[in-house]
Design a protein with these regions (language model features):
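N-terminal hydrophobic/helix-forming segments and targeting peptides
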Residues: 1-354
Length: 354
């Protein structure tokens, strides 16, 4: 079942792509009772279920640990920090938000993303989208030397400032990094729920790094685990606030979205149908999506080795790749139920049919 406190711990941790250490620390603590951990040099974290037995097919449960953010490019003489985006951002979503500039020791400096005020903008500037190079981070330093003394430096990771909160009346979560820390938390919940159950498959969780910059971690996890099938958990961008109802396929509160296609993968139709049939049988709400954009770690997983049958369980996230997202714990719970049903019914014979 959904663990709200766990979601908050994992989502609040600092961890832009390449700097996921704090996230891994939380996952290690929360999952210590579920099996044994391994880690590689790219900061991928592997959790092998205690009950795994030789000779059974292996299922990789994938979710990425990194979040979108920024990195300090240089420090101006006036103490302002210029930066580059890490992951996909829409420039208009960046200014006037608070950020955390991470020091070497892991502590952070609060800052605000600044831009030229409208009072000083030309008419053309007011009508155009600002270039990210025109933005800067203000940490309150009045000189380059002061910024350095405060702990800022070239290549400092910069994390969106947001603390995960939960509204029990609406069952909605508000916070950062739902893409895909919700998946990380869901995997732990699933493995916890299945602790006492005998399965016909082995489970290995792959908490992958650097998804937001090109699914890099998943390329390693696929090779190391060499699974027979994979389930990729993702925070999928919700489309329910801007598309007409007949086009909406990722609605917050209506269950996880299982995509048939995106820009990098055509989902294995047999594994997909297996999952959808189980959802119908167990009355688990799900949504079906046909995406002509976007991609997930499944892009790397399904092409590994001789090919890995892979599906994506996408938890809807409004305003993904911004400081604040909105997701429903009902969708998280439905994702947990669906994953449990899939894993409880998988066998060597069924996998061979994919």
């Amino acid at each position: 079942m959904t663990n709200i406190k766990r979601i908050q711990r994992i989502c609040d941790a600092n961890g832009i792509s390449g700097f996921e250490d704090a996230v891994l620390e939380v996952i290690r603590k929360d999952g210590a009772h579920l099996g044994s951990f391994e880690e590689d040099s790219l900061r991928n974290l592997y959790l092998s279920r205690t009950q795994n037995q030789e000779g059974k097919p292996t299922v990789l449960l994938d979710a990425h640990t990194d979040e979108v953010g920024f990195m300090v490019k240089c420090i101006r003489e006036d103490g302002m920090l210029e930066f580059i985006p890490i992951g996909g951002w829409v420039t208009t979503n960046i200014p006037a938000h608070m950020v955390r500039v991470q020091r070497r020791d892991g502590s952070t400096i609060p800052g605000i993303v600044g831009s030229k005020p409208p009072h000083y903008q030309s008419e053309a500037e007011r009508k155009s989208v600002p270039d990210i190079s025109s933005l800067f981070i203000d940490i309150g330093a009045s000189s380059k030397q002061q910024a350095i003394e405060m702990g800022a430096e070239v290549a400092s990771p910069v994390i969106p400032e947001a603390t995960c909160t939960y509204n029990p009346e609406t069952k909605l979560l508000f916070g950062k990094a739902f893409d895909c820390r919700l998946g990380c938390s869901t995997i732990l919940d699933v493995m916890e729920d299945l602790q006492e159950e005998t399965l016909d498959v082995n489970l290995v969780a792959g908490f992958a790094s650097q998804e937001e910059v090109g699914c890099r971690g998943a390329q390693l996890t696929a090779r190391k685990v060499n699974p027979d099938v994979a389930i990729c958990f993702e925070g999928s961008p919700a489309d329910d606030t801007f598309l007409p109802p007949y086009q909406q396929q990722t609605i917050v509160g209506k269950g996880p979205m299982l995509r048939f296609i995106d820009s990098k993968m055509i989902t294995n139709p047999r594994f997909q149908r297996f999952a959808l049939d189980l959802a119908e049988k167990h009355q688990i709400p799900v949504q079906q999506g046909v995406r002509n954009g976007g991609a997930t770690n499944a892009a790397a997983l399904h092409l590994s080795g001789q090919g890995i049958p892979t599906i994506v369980i996408g938890i809807p996230v409004r305003y993904a790749h911004t400081h604040w997202g909105i997701s429903s714990t009902e969708d998280v719970e439905s994702s947990i139920r669906l994953a449990r049903a899939i894993l409880s019914n998988l066998s060597e014979e069924i996998i061979a049919g994919f």
